[in-house]
Regions:
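Secreted/extracellular ectodomain signature
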Residues: 8, 25-131
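N-terminal export signals
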Residues: 5-25
Length: 131
């Protein structure tokens, strides 16, 4: 009986000695810095587009536009990430090209998935022209 209590006490103390330093070393989550082009941004939004459906393209552009209106261009950092068939939004020939250009002038960033570009280039032998 005494051995059991001694063993339980030893295991409990060992656990505390192991866990306590780990708890003491955990840091508070890092607060991300605003993008350099939006130093006063208070809101950060990422929108994704993975379809070349015009309805979805218009919806993403509309959401970005509404966010700019709601928060103001200097208070919100918006990034639209296109991958897969969604990269069609950023082609010169896309019907919404003028809307994309307008959002870019208001500070919205548009990024294209590099893996998508690499895959298209590998399959077709030509890298798509994205602006």
């Amino acid at each position: 009986m005494n051995r059991r209590r001694l063993l339980q006490g030893f295991l409990g103390a060992s656990a505390m000695l192991t866990v306590a330093p780990a708890l003491a070393q955990t840091e508070a989550p890092a607060i991300s810095k605003p993008p350099e082009d939006k130093p006063f941004a208070e809101h950060f939004v990422a929108l994704q587009l993975s379809d070349s459906d015009p309805k979805k393209e218009r919806l993403v552009l509309s959401v970005a536009s509404n966010l700019l209106k709601a928060y103001g261009a200097d208070k919100v950092a918006i990034e639209v990430v296109a991958f897969g068939p969604g990269i069609d939004l950023l082609r010169e020939t896309n019907e919404f090209r003028s809307l994309v250009d307008s959002l870019v002038t208001q500070g919205v960033r548009f990024d294209v998935c590099g893996n998508t570009l690499d895959t298209i280039e590998r399959e077709t032998g030509k890298r798509p022209a994205i602006n």
